[in-house]
Amino acid sequence: MTARPDSDQDMPLVAHLTELRSRLLRSVAAVLLIFAALFYFAQDIYALVSAPLRAYLPEGATMIATGVASPFLAPFKLTLMISLFLAMPVVLHQVWGFIAPGLYQHEKRIAMPLMASSVLLFYAGMAFAYFVVFPIMFGFFASVTPEGVAMMTDIGQYLDFVLTLFFAFGVAFEVPVATFLLIWVGIVDVASLRNSRPYVIVGCFVVGMVLTPPDVFSQTLLAVPMWLLFEIGVFFGARIRHREEPAASDGPSQP
């Protein structure tokens, strides 16, 4: 069996805690630096994020602020969350630097691409929500507004709504990584996942039903990408399994 690095085995607990503290501080510093750079543009960032809704507001209608501090707090909160999202590569790099010494070499070869793909897929999920889901969703909401009701959304409630969807779609797009990990660590095998494909498809549509307006088109916009991402995870999980099986069979046999 491949031994873990001696440097990791010999490090005392205090050294581990000191390194953890240092990496946490670097992660926080990265978030704060990005926030400081973006804070001047906080109003513009909020205008950009609210554009999908404002495009469907009736002529002359605007968003409203029901709280005294909402005009300041909503852009502030949004900019802070955007800073956290943008700092994810730095945060994951610090996480990688902390856990890498304790990994086997073959684990390192897989872990780094998984972390990078996790970030990219999370960003892809957010972009999909903004460019595809939001226009359809807000267009639907505007079309079903009862007659005599003015559609004037509070900026704080809108922010909470879109942040929830950003996070939901970002996590939903992590399906390939989750599927790959389940196969790689041996919790499930490829055959079981392929046999459960009908249940996965139904589950994707259930998630789509929960996260999108109650129309088939919007549900399909989320369900189909989730299913395709699941298939991608199964495909790469099967490939890594096929690579590892010959390596295991070629290993030294016990006398």
UniProtKB/Swiss-Prot annotation:
GO terms for biological process: intracellular protein transmembrane transport; protein transport by the Tat complex. GO terms for cellular component: TAT protein transport complex. It is found in: Cell membrane. Keywords: Cell membrane, Membrane, Protein transport, Translocation, Transmembrane, Transmembrane helix, Transport. The chain crosses the membrane at residues 28-48, 56-76, 80-100, 121-141, 165-185, 195-212, 216-236. GO terms for molecular function: proton motive force dependent protein transmembrane transporter activity. InterPro entries: Sec-indep_translocase_CS (IPR019820), TatC (IPR002033). It is a multi-pass membrane protein. The Tat system comprises two distinct complexes: a TatABC complex, containing multiple copies of TatA, TatB and TatC subunits, and a separate TatA complex, containing only TatA subunits. Substrates initially bind to the TatABC complex, which probably triggers association of the separate TatA complex to form the active translocon. Belongs to the TatC family. Part of the twin-arginine translocation (Tat) system that transports large folded proteins containing a characteristic twin-arginine motif in their signal peptide across membranes. Together with TatB, TatC is part of a receptor directly interacting with Tat signal peptides. This is Sec-independent protein translocase protein TatC. The gene is tatC.
